């Protein structure tokens, strides 16, 4: 019989909150008897915005802002029903986007 995998992608602007949420998921999965592959750090997406400092003149004077989106990937191999229940009840920090594929 084919083994089931649960793939979890996490995204956040703050890498500390992301790593904390990742460790919570890994600990929950290991406690219920599933094997975990990861966390795998994916490339950080950097989005830059350039705006004029002055509203009227001085085109040469500009300011740059950036948003960094950090990502992690987890694979849970052979999850038990207890693993799925524990992951559904898990309360993660605000600001972490979670995508789950089965």
UniProtKB/Swiss-Prot annotation:
Gene Ontology biological process terms, A to Z: translation
NCBIfam families documented for this protein: PRK00596.1 (NF001861), rpsJ_bact (TIGR01049)
Organism name: Rhodospirillum centenum (strain ATCC 51521 / SW)
Family annotation (Gene3D superfamilies): Ribosomal protein S10 domain
KW Ribonucleoprotein (keyword) present: yes
Record lineage: Bacteria, Pseudomonadati, Pseudomonadota, Alphaproteobacteria, Rhodospirillales
Name recorded for this polypeptide: Small ribosomal subunit protein uS10
Job of this protein: Involved in the binding of tRNA to the ribosomes.
Family named by the database record: Belongs to the universal ribosomal protein uS10 family.
SUPFAM superfamilies: Ribosomal protein S10
Pfam families named in the record: Ribosomal_S10 (PF00338)
The keyword Ribonucleoprotein belongs to this UniProt entry's keyword annotation: yes
Keywords carried by this UniProt record: Ribonucleoprotein, Ribosomal protein
């Amino acid at each position: 019989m084919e083994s089931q995998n649960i793939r979890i992608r996490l995204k956040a602007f703050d890498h500390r909150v992301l790593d904390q949420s990742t460790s919570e998921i890994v600990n929950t999965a290991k406690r219920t008897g599933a094997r975990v592959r990861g966390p795998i750090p994916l490339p950080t997406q950097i989005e830059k915005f350039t705006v004029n400092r002055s509203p009227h003149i001085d085109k040469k004077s500009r300011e740059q802002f950036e948003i960094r989106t950090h990502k992690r990937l987890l694979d849970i191999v052979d999850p038990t029903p207890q693993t799925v229940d524990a992951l559904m009840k898990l309360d993660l920090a605000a600001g972490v986007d979670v995508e789950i594929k089965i």
